[in-house]
Amino acid sequence: MPTSTQMKSKKNLHGILGVALLVCSEILMLKGIEPFASWFYYCAWWSYILIVDSLIYTIKKNSLIMNRGGEFLLMLFWSVFIWTFFEAVNLVLKNWYYVNVVAYRFIRWPGYAFAYATVLPGVFETTELLESLGVFKKSRVKPLSVNRYWIVGLLTLGIVSLGGVLLYPTYCFPLTWGFLIFLLEPINYLKGGTSILREWERGTLRKFYLLLLAGFICGALWEFWNFWAVTKWIYTVPFFEELKLFEMPILGFLGFPPFTVECYVFYNFISLFRYQRGWEEDTYGPNQGKRVKFPFAVGTFIAVSLFCLLTFSAMDEKTVNSYWPDVGELQMMRPEVLEYFASRGITTPHALLATIGSAQGKKELAQKCAISESEITRWVHLAQLSLVKGMGTRNAYVLTVIGVESFSDLAAQDPALLYDKLVTLAKEQLRPKGTAPPREAIVRLWVREARKKASNHQKVP
C-alpha cells in the first residue's frame, strides 16, 4: 500500500489531457475535419475515461488508472471481448448496424477494438465516481436469504431468456440486456466471488443502484456522442423504429442500466479464474501474489482473440452497411472531373456539396470543366442521396441502377417494393463487389428519412 506521501507525489494530469482532447475533438468534429468528424466517438469516450478517473483520484487519492493500472489494461482486453460478444448476439438480433466505417480492414478491425475497449472502463469508472461522491451511501434494504430456490430460479430464468433471444429475437430482444445476470450471478455467488446477491444478503443493494445509475448516464452519453459522429451505429429495433432520441428508440434507454449490471456480473465471473481479483479498490489488492498459469493465460488470449476476429469478419458482412463515402463510387463523373476534384481534396459527398451545392458553385464548375449545370445538379442530388441515414456512396449508386437518383425519388418509393428490387439486383450480381443488400428495416429507415428531408425541402420558401 503506497504511503500518503507517495500518493501525493503522483501527477494527476490525465484529466487535463482528457478535457483538452474532448474540447479539441468537439471543435474539429463540428468543423467536419477528419479524422475527428468520423472518429469523434472514440475521442469523446477516451477523453471521458481520463476525466472521470482524474476526478476519482482527486476525491479519494485512489483510482483505476493511477493506482490499478495493470487492472485497467487488462480491463481493456476484456472490454473488447465482452462487447464483441454482444456484437455476435446482434448477428441474430439485427438490432443495430454501422455506417461510414473505414474501408480498410487493417484500420477497421483495430478501430472496432479501440472503440469496444472503452465500454467497461466507461461504465465502471462512472460507477466508482458515483460511489466516491457518496451516492446511495445510506441505502439499506431488507436482507435476502439466498437459498437453492433462488439459485435454480435465476439459472432457469437465464437459460430461458437466452433461448428466447436466440430463437425468437423479434420479440425477446430486450432479454439480451439481462440474461447474463441470471446465468452468471448465481455462479459468482456460489464460488465466493464478488456478488450482488451476497451484498443483498448483507442488507444493501448500493452497488446495484450505482450500476443502474451509471448505465443510464453512460447510455445517454453513448447515444449523444454517437449521434454527432460520421462513423456511427443506427438502430433497427422491432416495433420502435419511429420514436427516437438521437438514434435510439426512447424505450431503448431502459436497456442501458441492466446492461451495466450485466457487464459487472460478467467481469466478476471472469475474475473467478483470476483468484477473484477485481477492478475495485477492495477486490484489487487480495491475491496479488498469485498468477494465472501461463498456458491457461495464453490459451485464453488466443481463444478470445480468435472469437473477436471471427466476429469482426461476420460484422463486416452482416452489420456494416456502408463505408467512408467516396464520390468516385457514385460512377457519375468522367475521370478527368474526378481528377480535378481529387486535386482539390474533394473526395466525399460533404466536400462536393460544400463546393457545388450553391448556384454560384455550380456556375463556376460548369465554366471550368465545360459541364452543363443540369449535370452538376444531378451530382448534387446523388451526393445528397448518399448522405441519407449514412447510406453511403455504394448504396446510393445501386439505387441509381433502379432509377432512384435523389432523396425525392427515394421518398416516393414503397419500402417493401424497393427492398425486393434491391434483393433482385443482388441476385443478378449488379451490386458493387463486396457489398450485400441492406435489410428491409434499413430500407424503411432510408425511405422514412428521405420523406422527412423532402417534406422539409418543400417547406423552405
Regions found by a protein language model. Give the residues of each.
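C-terminal extensions
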Residues: 317-461
